[in-house]
Amino acid sequence: RELKYIFITHLHPDHYLGLEVIKSYYPDARVIAYQKAADDINDAYDFKIDYWGNTVLKSNGANIKFSVEKWQQDEITLEGEQIKILGLLCGDCTDIAALWLEKSRTLIASDLVFADCHVWIADMRTPEILKNWFKTLDTLEALEPLRVIPGHSSAALTLHPCAISFTLQYINDFIRELKRSKDAAQLVATMDRLYPDYPIRICLEYSAKILKDRYVWPGDWPLSLRHLASGY
């Protein structure tokens, strides 16, 4: 099959630093993102390559930048089916573009939704920002999807819509224990008891360090996040 588009949902680097591999097989595919998300990604790209590609992963990291086109329309047509872009919503960062396939009632949620894994909460620096994620989850629930493709999940990916409620429960548990814990280590230990052996541990550890211990992370983007202290 011909691959026409590679749709990037938001600026977090795990969603586009692998483009080099995909483009090696599909060199003519257009890399697109919805409205402001395209600007966010293009602005972040050099920084993310330098931090993750050169500093963290080194020889295993990405080192090629691809231009991301700004997609202005509210839908994409794929093999005759209209895929609706649900606008820019708040999830584990602001301005994430989810996709909705009405015919099959399938939600491609990206990082608005996680399934049976630790959740990245580090960018939700204040309760006011976090409220927008809760509003997003309400919006997604109201769609009554039959299948939900989360941004991250355990290996046992089920596509079950309960991933939406899982995400809400995890966030509520994390924030409750954040307020109770004396430091990040205690918070991590408590969440480990609540969610034993859950994958993507980096999400838990960094969220705890940044929000509880107020760790200034050199990988933060936009840079303004480094100057936005935890409000919990």
Where are these regions (language model features)?
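Beta-strand-turn-beta hairpins that frame and shape the catalytic cleft
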Residues: 75-84, 101-107
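Stable alpha-helical elements in mature extracytoplasmic
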Residues: 15-18, 37, 129, 133-136, ...
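Active-site HxH/HxHxD metal-binding segment of metal-dependent hydrolases
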Residues: 2-77
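Extracellular/periplasmic catalytic domains that process cell-envelope and extracellular macromolecules
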Residues: 24-25, 76-79, 91-92, 100
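Metallo-beta-lactamase
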Residues: 88-91, 95-173, 177-179
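A mature extracytoplasmic/lumenal domain signature
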Residues: 7-12, 35-37, 82, 89, ...
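Accessory terminal helices/loops
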Residues: 40, 51, 142-147, 155-232
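Loop/turn elements at helix/coil->beta-strand transitions in domains of secreted/extracellular proteins
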Residues: 2-4, 27-30, 81-82, 103, ...
